[in-house]
Amino acid sequence: MGEKNSSKVLTTGFGIPVGDDQNSLTAGNRGPVLMQDVHLLDKLSHFDHERIPERVVHAKGAGAGGYFEVTADVTKYTKAKFLSEIGKRTEVFVRFSTVGGEKGSADSARDPRGFAVKFYTEDGNYDLVGNNTPVFFIRDPLKFPDFIHTQKRNPATNCKDPDMFWDFLSLTPESIHQVTILFSDRGTPATYRNMNGYSSHTYKWYNEKGEYFWVQYHFKTDQGIKNLTLEEAEKIGGSDPDHATRDLYEAIKKGDYPSWTLEMQIMTPEQAEDYRFDIRDITKVWPHGDFPTMKIGKLVLNRNPTNYFAEVEQAAFSPANLVPGIGISPDKMLQGRVFSYHDTHIHRLGPNYNLIPVNAPKYSPENSYQRDGFMRVDANGGSGPNYWPNSFGGPSPDSVYLEPPFGVSGLAARTLYTHPNDDFVQAGNLYRDVMTDYDRENLVGNIVSHLSAAQKRIQLRQTALFFKADRDYGSRVAKGLELDIKEVERLANMTNEERARATER
């Protein structure tokens, strides 16, 4: 049997001591395995069920723990307790990820990066579920399943499909801003430590007086922005597909703690009402010249997970997890995510995923009437009442936590989104005014490399969108793809419906 080499005795999952973990119970030295070898059966059965469903998006990720510290007074904007005083620290857990790839995909893939922060506050958990880009591809959640399908694998070939990818985007002009960011070098960050994080959505802050404000979050990396070129990303993807995961873990392990400065953009309801575009449209940014940022805090990651599955894989973030002082806006995509994230966690982790330690509130006891369900691993409410109202001392609502009201109006209907905000202006401004010559050269090269694999009719349709954003932008892509620039310009002058008909198969 060999000598015992540990003070700990190996047991089954139920705490029963194990005498031998190397040899199955058999009939004789070379005989068949006996069905009564319950240790073997238990070990194999647990192994058979080790894998849980991977996330439908953001499957590949890394995470770490740390803290958030307030550095500015924001009490006139929000009554959130974790933001109530300068110097206050709140424990956090952060998960970074790619979006479209599977769990084993490369960290260097051209893809937005998830940037999700869980704040363990005294009023429960607050989840800020953002990306490393300030905008997104679509503004209506009804389009989200279709969009994600195009970013994954062809249902027939099971391969990534440039036709699917670009067909959807070229038929969805609102995506042009995010596409321009994605195919810049910011679409391939060097590491998770060298990228920013954004709420992307507009959220609502409200104070003790019941006044509310619209806000956006910007986590600016203190390590500096560093990106990979197309060639660098492809090389690293082949030689070290887990490079960003490893980089984060090793930096924290040696005490080189990454940090981000939280900057906020804040707008009054009156400013929003009169602004030149819909400030809740996730395909747009708020110009910093109109709404400068305000530094309010510091995010620091100083603790590696002790077990990846327990903390990172089982971590579940939801934009529905809001604490008093913070609310959602009428952003359509945000309202869709408020449902969808919680729903997918139930599928992946079960209805009691909030009891998993990484997801459980640490500084605010859970006092709800939720009971039973798979993996209810706490006292399940004990002998207390499981309904409200009751007269047996159960927890009761408190109106002090109600959000202040705000007005909404309109006829209920499925209507085309309309607003005087051209979908191409900000993409053009980004190309002309923000990017350098080097940035523009890489952007065009990255697009041509990927779009060239799609059908020519799709190339023409998508290049027309680049042309609408900026003439030079579209012309350079057309040249790289060897397209007729006159045909591109003709398509650019059409409506979206006309352009779709003109480029049908």
Curated annotation (Swiss-Prot):
Gene3D superfamilies: Catalase core domain. GO terms for biological process: hydrogen peroxide catabolic process; response to hydrogen peroxide. Keywords: Heme, Hydrogen peroxide, Iron, Metal-binding, Oxidoreductase, Peroxidase. Coiled coil: none annotated. The active site is at residues 58, 131. CDD domains: catalase_clade_3. Belongs to the catalase family. This is Catalase. It comes from Methanosarcina barkeri (strain Fusaro / DSM 804).
